[in-house]
């Protein structure tokens, strides 16, 4: 019975939309693939939309029109079109469309990442840039990073002495979570409510906010579809677990007067009016929404990036050997390894860039929404159009990168291209007003962790595995980590 209702309602709304379209002036929209009635191009997305959209762009062009239910969208897939979206028309393309499940997990867009462009968003952005993610504040947390990495190294040593396998993805995500919990929440992950479900909840949140949800593309009927598929219940589950964690962290902070200089402390001062946020008075939901961004951005930037780097290194022994030789030559017998050592490790920096090129953690940026009519590349982009930026396509474009599927760190030798949002051939953290503000905090931990792993240990695969068996498939969500866990055996060395 419910399916007859779904079909009937879908045709009703399709009739309204078609009638509306016939009354509008014909526009010079970008080319795109044929679409089906009602669902448009949703059937062409597949399980990994960034890959499917890349293939479609090879046929239909660098700026491509699509229809997702009742939503009109365009996809930018080359450095030139992406530059138009993120730089030339950054102000006009800076807002966000309403998305059902991001609205829920961000406490009705009280965050930075999903909030529409507004005075509130501008004030939060300014606060994060000036207060949370300055170079000075990132450096102030260096002791926490060093303590947590030292503890992680001790764990690896124990496994090396026993020749035991380490689940690198699991342990690296936990490492980044431990750092973020201390610098952001003043609480130990080990004693928090997320201690046993941390990775599951973080990845679940990313899947929920990154899915192409029916509720976003079909009025009324979409919510019913999401309840049938289980997306709605999954969203509620991860939201409640995350909310409970935030409550615990805030309560702990309020009860322990010894906790100082963390991110919750700053936000609680704003709640009390001790520190300003322009004309806005922060509420508890504002605090939680901002904390969600801090937690997610820090974990995904560092934990999953290091996992991908180690995956490519173990799969490319030549690169591993070269990277370790450089690290050991530069560090030598120095006991006090610091993040600043990365500045002398030119080849390791190339390895990190190449990893971020092949495996951008957010291959399809959060959609933007055109706040007014604009023209890109001679094509009309009507107001309210959803704009997707396919970073995956940009960074695997054969016209930009020779042998784009091959891991070649040397391609960055004598190259000025960097991942900091200026070069549109390499944008793993985005660019413009919506660029990830937590990049510096996350990458500081990436550098410190990798230097320690490569300096102190050699690495090998478990018995019976060859490098051909190392899988490079990614999971899909807003963030795309390695799908199959990376299992490695650490080996003690003279530098351990």
From Swiss-Prot:
Class in the EC hierarchy, top level: oxidoreductase
E.C. designation(s): 1.14.-.-
Residues the record lists as binding heme: 436
InterPro entries: Cyt_P450, Cyt_P450_CS, Cyt_P450_E_grp-I, Cyt_P450_sf
Transmembrane segments: 1-21
Sorted UniProt keywords: Heme, Iron, Membrane, Metal-binding, Monooxygenase, Oxidoreductase, Transmembrane, Transmembrane helix
Cofactor section: heme
Major localization listed first in the record, in broad terms: membrane
UniProt cross-references to SUPFAM superfamilies, sorted A to Z: Cytochrome P450 (SSF48264)
Membrane topology: Single-pass membrane protein
Keyword Isomerase found: no
GO molecular function: heme binding; iron ion binding; monooxygenase activity; oxidoreductase activity, acting on paired donors, with incorporation or reduction of molecular oxygen
Gene3D superfamilies named among the record's database cross-references: Cytochrome P450
Record GO cellular component, one term: membrane
Compartments in which it is found: Membrane
Keyword rRNA-binding: no
Family recorded in the similarity comment: Belongs to the cytochrome P450 family.
Protein name: Cytochrome P450 71B14
Organism for this UniProt entry: Arabidopsis thaliana
Lineage: Eukaryota, Viridiplantae, Streptophyta, Embryophyta, Tracheophyta
């Amino acid at each position: 019975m419910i399916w007859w209702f779904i079909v009937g309602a879908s045709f009703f709304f399709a009739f309204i939309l078609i009638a509306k379209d016939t009354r509008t002036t014909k526009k010079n929209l970008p080319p795109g693939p044929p679409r089906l009635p009602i669902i448009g191009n949703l059937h062409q997305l597949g399980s990994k939309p960034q890959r499917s959209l890349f293939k479609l762009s090879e046929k239909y062009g660098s700026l491509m029109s699509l229809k997702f239910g009742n939503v009109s969208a365009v996809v930018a897939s080359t450095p030139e079109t992406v530059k138009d979206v993120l730089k030339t028309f950054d102000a006009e393309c800076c807002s966000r469309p309403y998305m059902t499940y991001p609205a829920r997990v961000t406490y009705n867009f009280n965050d930075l990442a999903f909030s529409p462009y507004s005075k509130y968003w501008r004030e939060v952005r300014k606060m994060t840039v000036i207060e949370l993610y300055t170079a000075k504040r990132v450096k102030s947390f260096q002791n926490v990073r060093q303590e947590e990495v030292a503890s992680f190294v001790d764990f690896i040593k124990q496994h090396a002495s026993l020749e035991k396998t380490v689940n690198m993805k699991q342990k690296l995500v936990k490492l980044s979570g431990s750092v973020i919990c201390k610098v952001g929440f003043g609480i130990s992950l080990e004693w928090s409510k997320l201690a046993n479900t941390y990775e599951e909840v973080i990845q679940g949140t990313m899947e929920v906010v990154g899915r192409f949800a029916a509720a976003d593309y079909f009025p009324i009927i979409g919510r019913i579809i999401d309840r049938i598929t289980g997306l709605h219940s999954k969203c509620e589950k991860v939201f409640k677990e995350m909310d409970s964690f935030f409550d615990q962290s805030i309560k702990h902070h309020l009860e322990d007067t010894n906790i100082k200089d963390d991110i919750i402390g700053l936000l609680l001062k704003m709640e009390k009016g001790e520190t300003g946020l322009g004309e806005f008075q922060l509420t508890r939901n504002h605090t939680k929404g901002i904390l969600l961004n801090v937690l997610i951005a820090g974990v995904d930037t560092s934990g999953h990036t290091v996992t991908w780097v180690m995956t490519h290194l173990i799969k490319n022994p030549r690169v591993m050997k070269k990277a370790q030789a450089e690290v050991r030559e530069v560090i030598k017998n120095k006991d006090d390894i610091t993040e600043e050592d990365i500045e002398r490790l030119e080849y390791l920096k190339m390895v990190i860039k190449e990893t971020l090129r092949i495996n951008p953690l957010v291959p399809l940026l959060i959609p933007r929404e055109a706040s007014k009519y604009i023209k890109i590349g001679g094509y009309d982009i009507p107001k309210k159009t959803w704009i997707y930026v396919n970073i995956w396509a940009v960074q695997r474009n054969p016209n930009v990168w020779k042998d784009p599927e091959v891991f070649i760190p040397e391609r960055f030798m004598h190259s000025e291209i960097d991942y900091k949002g200026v070069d549109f051939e390499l944008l793993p953290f985005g660019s413009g007003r919506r660029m990830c503000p937590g990049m510096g905090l996350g990458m500081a931990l990436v550098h410190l962790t990798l230097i320690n792993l490569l300096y102190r240990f050699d690495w090998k695969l478990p018995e019976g595995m060859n490098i051909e068996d190392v899988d490079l498939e990614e999971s899909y969500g807003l963030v795309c980590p390695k799908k199959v866990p990376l299992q490695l055996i650490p080996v003690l060395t003279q530098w351990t």
